[in-house]
A protein has these predicted regions:
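Outer-membrane beta-barrel porins/channels
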Residues: 46, 157-490
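Bacterial Sec-dependent N-terminal signal peptides
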Residues: 1-44, 393
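Generic recognition of cysteine residues
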Residues: 2-6, 12, 22, 132, ...
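The feature marks either
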Residues: 35, 145-147, 236
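N-terminal, post-signal peptide beta-strand-biased segments of exported outer-membrane/organellar beta-barrel
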Residues: 39-154, 158
Length: 490
């Protein structure tokens, strides 16, 4: 499941209020905007393009032929979405029906779900970025805003919603619904980076980048389990709990219970939790205007390229090895406590209260999760950013004007790693002209191709060209830069 790039940007940066409908859409769909380095790895099709500076993000040892100055924002803007469940056309339907809780219980939606549904999204844009050659060294600097998110939702969550709508024939005298697993992670920060690439000799180039990180926000919600159990006699197996009334429930005898184990950790300016009369979180408010720096961290990229001769080269890199330390004053920890969610028909009104908790029609049911903020746990916390490994092999032909390459990348993301294999064909007739055709068969199930081109100052590229409404992943990078002088050695 996935949400469109524009929706995610709105969700992270401009949303004035995180309404329940938006939360439902996020829980059903979510997130990943940019390419897969867990926070803006560049499009993989750039890896073997010697004229593209964006490949430095994949491997700091791969310096471009010329220096550059990226124009603010439009010098480097990239985004991507990926899901293991739904295509881009389904995303449009999800956003269109975000206010309609019934949509997420329809056969059309439910039939496309897997046992565990993953989605991820990341986005990045440069505030400023530049690089230039000095002798055999290439220096670069950047200030980049990055955002990424990952979501996992079990199908059982939607099965339970359908149960509460009376869509499944259930024996409520011995009903048990176990919902295991599920988490949401969102991270937003600014990267201040300085990179250096050194051509050691004709065979070896080394590169590295050190980064200071300014954390703007981090949210981690994990649900280990949710168990709903009833031992109720006298109920219709097809009961729609969302329309149940006290008269209908008065016929029932027995007990019911809800047991949830969940944890919420967050650090962000402008993120406020509203509490119910019983003291648990029942609403979330986000004020984008109050967003600021509430965490500091550091990271590094390391890379190497080895060319045994003029025709072949091997390369490897690890990027985004780092962490962010979030301040105590902006950190909230909350834990579920459902000890009071036990109901007995002998207690007047108990079953109606049970109905109010379980039949909200929301995928993210805060009333059922019963998250209580622990003031004693309001202390600093540390989170890792998502690192990526890259391994490449390249063959150069036609006096270095044609390149054929293979690239393997693995993003060490949560809740699952994302691996991709990219086969690339590149034609580089002039220093300011570069064209690439690529094919990445794993993440998109072999249903898409990649294209990239650099025409003077303009760059456009994608690893997954939109080809059908069922495409489950898509990314794009657009950039405009001012070219500077090239390297002065052979």
């Amino acid at each position: 499941m996935c949400i469109s790039c524009c929706f995610f940007i709105e969700y992270c940066f401009t949303m004035k209020r995180l309404r329940p409908a938006c939360m439902r859409a996020a829980i059903v769909a979510l997130l990943v905007l940019a390419t897969a380095t867990g926070n803006a790895q560049s499009v993989r099709s750039t890896y073997f393009m010697e004229g593209a500076q964006y490949r430095l993000q994949l491997n700091p040892a791969l310096a471009p032929e010329r220096g550059y100055i990226n124009l603010p924002v439009i010098g480097h803007a990239e985004a991507s979405v990926r899901s293991n469940t739904m295509g881009l056309n389904d995303v449009v339907d999800i956003i269109k029906n975000a206010d309609d809780a019934d949509y997420f219980t329809t056969d059309k939606f439910y039939g496309k779900l897997k046992d565990m549904n993953h989605a991820s999204a990341t986005a990045a844009t440069d505030v400023i970025a530049a690089g230039f050659w000095h002798g055999k060294g290439f220096m670069s600097l950047n200030m980049t805003v990055k955002a990424d998110g990952n979501l996992s939702v079990p199908r059982e969550m939607f099965s339970f919603m359908r149960d509460m709508k009376g869509m499944n024939h259930n024996d409520y005298s011995n009903y048990l619904r176990d919902i295991n697993g599920g988490d949401l992670n969102v991270n937003v920060y600014t990267e201040l980076g300085f990179g250096y690439t050194r051509v050691i000799n004709d065979h070896v180039s080394l590169g590295g980048r050190v980064k200071g990180l300014l954390g703007h926000g981090n949210v981690s919600l994990k649900m280990e389990k949710a168990q709903i159990k009833t031992n109720l006699e006298g109920l219709d197996p097809d009961l729609d709990w969302t329309t149940a009334d006290p008269i209908m429930l008065a016929k029932a005898t027995g007990s019911a219970s809800v047991d949830v184990k969940a944890t919420l950790e967050s650090s962000a300016h402008g993120l406020n939790y509203k509490l119910s009369r019983d003291g648990y979180i029942d609403d979330v408010e986000f004020k984008a205007g109050k967003m600021g720096v509430c965490g500091l961290g550091a990271a590094m990229d390391l890379g190497i390229e080895y060319s045994p001769n003029d025709m072949f080269s091997l390369s490897a890199a690890v990027t985004d090895l780092g962490f962010i330390r979030w301040s105590k004053g902006n950190t909230v920890r909350a834990y579920s406590n459902t000890s009071d969610l036990n109901y007995d028909s002998n207690n007047p009104g108990d079953l109606m209260r049970f109905t109010d908790v379980v039949a909200t029609g929301k995928a993210l049911n805060l009333d059922m999760m019963r998250l209580y903020i622990d003031e004693q746990e309001a202390k600093a916390r540390t989170t890792n950013i998502t690192s990526t490994m890259a391994l490449g092999a390249e063959c150069r032909l036609m006096e270095n004007r044609m390149h054929i390459g293979t690239l393997f990348t693995n993003r060490f993301s949560k809740p699952e790693n994302q691996s991709e294999l990219t086969f690339s064909f590149n034609y580089h007739p002039r220093s300011l002209l570069d064209f690439t055709f690529s094919y990445s068969p794993i993440l998109c199930s072999g249903q898409s191709i990649g294209l990239a081109m650099k025409l003077g100052p303009l760059f456009i590229g994608t690893d997954y060209l939109y080809m059908s409404k069922n495409t489950k992943c898509c990314n794009a990078l657009v950039g405009i830069s001012v070219p500077l002088g090239g390297r002065s050695f052979d």
